[in-house]
Design a protein with these regions (language model features):
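Short, well-ordered alpha-helical microsegments
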Residues: 78, 132, 154-155, 214-218, ...
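A short, well-structured beta->alpha microelement
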Residues: 42-58, 245-268, 272-282
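C-terminal regulatory/interaction regions
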Residues: 20-31, 256-375
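Short internal beta-strands
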Residues: 84-92, 170, 228-239, 292
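Binuclear metal-ion centers of metallo-dependent hydrolases, dominated by the metallo-beta-lactamase
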Residues: 12, 18, 27-35, 162-163, ...
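Active-site-proximal loop/helix segment associated with metal-binding centers of metalloenzymes
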Residues: 127-139, 150, 154-155, 161, ...
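His/Asp/Glu-rich metal-coordinating catalytic cores
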Residues: 37-54, 58-63, 67, 73-212, ...
Length: 375
C-alpha cells in the first residue's frame, strides 16, 4: 500500500510507474531481439489492455500507458491519462472535449501508414461513429486488424466501413446472434417520422446515445427529407456541434434550453440521452410520448423493461450478417472474438464456417499483476 502522506504517496506512484515503464521496455527489447522464452504474438493481452510489443503501444488501453492507439472517442475506448494518443483526425474535436484540450494527440487521416518502433500502423474506417477506426498493424509482413466497434450498414453521419484484408482479425461481437438483423437506417427513420408526426398534441421524446446515435438520427431524418427543427438535450448538442463542424448533413436542430420555459413543446421531436429518462429534466415536457432507439430494442420485452412506450431498432454495431460478412471477407486465417457473444460467435465460426476462431480471452496473456510491481 502507498504511504499515508502526500509526498510519500507521490514518490510511491512515481516509482511504480517507472517500474512499469521498465517492464514495457524489456518487452520491446525482447520483441526486437527475440530473447523471450516463447515466440511473441503481434498483439498480447496485458492488465492495461491489448498491447503490441513491436510498437510498444496499446489499443484502447484500460489504464494509463505511454502510447495509446484509439479506435474511437466513446468513453469505454478512449480514457484519460495516457502519455500520447494516436487517432483519426476527424475524431480530434470530440477526443479533446472528452479527454482535455492539452492531450498530446497525433491526428491521422484514414489510410496513412506510420511507424512506431518496429510496427507499421494505419487507421481504416469502421463505420461506427464519426472518426471511428479499425487499426491495422503490420510487423515483418504479418498483418493483424483490430476492428474496434464497427457496422456494415450505410450511415450518412460517418465514413463507411472499409474492408481490410489481414492474417489475424480481432472482431467485436456485440450483436453476434441470428436474432439481430437490422433494417436500413432509412426504414427506421421513416418509422420515427411517422411515430412523431402521428401525435402532434404531445412532445415526442426519443432517447438515444448522445454520441453517434443522436447524430445518425439527425442525418437519417435529413436523408428522408425532414427539415423541421429537432430539439436537443444539452449532452446531445455538445457532440452534435462537432458533426456540424465536420459538414455532416443533418436536419436542423437547437438545444431545448434556448426555448422560453413557458413555450409549448407539443408536436416537437426531442433527442435526449437515456440518463435523462425519468429525471428532473423531463418535468418540462407535458405528457410526452417516449421511445428509445437502440439495437437492444430487438430483444423481446426490452422496451417494456426500460419503461418506454415505443422502441426503434437502430444500432451502430454490425448485426449477425454484418459480422459474418466481415470475417469471411477479411481472409483472416485466425480470428479472435471480443465483447458480447464471443464464445457463441467463435464456436459458430469454427463449427459452421471452418474458421480457426476463439474468444479473445484465449490470446496470449502477459499477466503482470500489481503485486509484482510493488516498490
Amino acid at each position: 500500500m502507498p504511504p499515508g502522506d502526500s509526498q510519500g504517496r507521490d514518490e510511491w506512484i512515481g516509482n511504480k510507474q517507472r517500474c512499469r515503464s521498465g517492464i514495457h521496455a524489456l518487452r520491446l527489447r525482447d520483441f526486437q531481439t527475440g530473447c523471450s522464452d516463447q515466440q511473441r504474438s503481434l498483439i498480447e493481452r496485458t492488465p492495461e489492455g491489448l498491447y503490441c510489443p513491436a510498437a510498444d503501444a496499446w489499443i484502447d488501453p484500460l489504464r494509463p500507458v505511454p502510447r495509446a492507439l484509439i479506435t474511437h472517442a466513446h468513453a469505454d475506448h478512449a480514457r484519460p491519462g495516457n502519455g500520447e494518443y494516436w487517432a483519426v483526425d476527424s475524431s480530434e474535436g470530440i477526443l479533446r472535449q472528452r479527454l482535455g484540450r492539452e492531450i498530446t494527440l497525433h491526428a491521422m487521416p484514414y489510410g496513412k501508414s506510420f511507424r512506431l518502433n518496429q510496427a507499421n500502423i494505419s487507421f481504416h474506417s469502421a463505420g461506427h461513429v464519426l472518426g471511428s477506426a479499425q487499426i491495422r498493424l503490420e510487423v515483418n509482413g504479418e498483418v493483424w486488424v483490430v476492428t474496434g466497434d464497427y457496422k456494415r450498414d450505410d450511415d450518412p453521419s460517418c465514413a463507411p466501413f472499409e474492408l481490410v484484408p489481414c492474417d489475424v482479425l480481432i472482431t467485436e461481437a456485440t450483436f453476434a446472434m441470428p436474432i439481430y438483423r437490422w433494417k436500413s437506417g432509412e426504414a427506421v427513420a421513416t418509422e420515427i417520422r411517422n411515430w412523431w408526426q402521428g401525435d402532434r398534441n404531445r412532445p415526442s421524446l426519443l432517447f438515444c446515445y448522445s454520441f453517434g446515435k443522436a447524430q445518425r438520427l439527425l442525418a437519417e431524418l435529413h436523408a428522408i427529407g425532414v427539415e423541421e427543427e429537432v430539439l436537443l438535450h444539452g449532452a446531445v448538442e455538445t457532440v452534435t456541434r462537432h458533426y456540424r463542424q465536420a459538414a455532416i448533413p443533418m436536419t436542423p436542430s437547437r438545444p431545448v434550453s434556448e426555448l422560453p420555459r413557458k413555450e409549448s413543446l407539443a408536436g416537437r421531436l426531442v433527442l435526449a440521452p437515456p440518463s435523462a429518462h425519468r429525471s428532473a429534466w423531463m418535468r418540462r415536457f407535458q405528457s410526452p410520448q417516449t421511445a428509445f432507439a437502440s439495437g437492444w430494442m430487438a430483444v423481446r420485452g426490452a422496451r417494456r423493461r426500460r419503461g418506454y412506450e415505443r422502441g426503434f431498432v437502430l444500432s451502430d454495431h454490425a448485426d449477425w450478417q454484418g459480422l459474418l460478412k466481415t470475417v469471411r471477407q477479411s481472409g483472416a486465417s485466425k480470428v479472435y472474438v471480443t465483447h458480447g457473444q464471443s464464445d457463441v460467435f467463435s464456436r459458430y465460426l469454427r463449427e459452421s464456417e471452418g474458421i480457426d476462431a476463439e474468444p479473445l480471452s484465449k490470446l496470449t496473456d502477459i499477466n503482470q499483476p500489481d503485486s509484482e510491481l510493488t516498490i
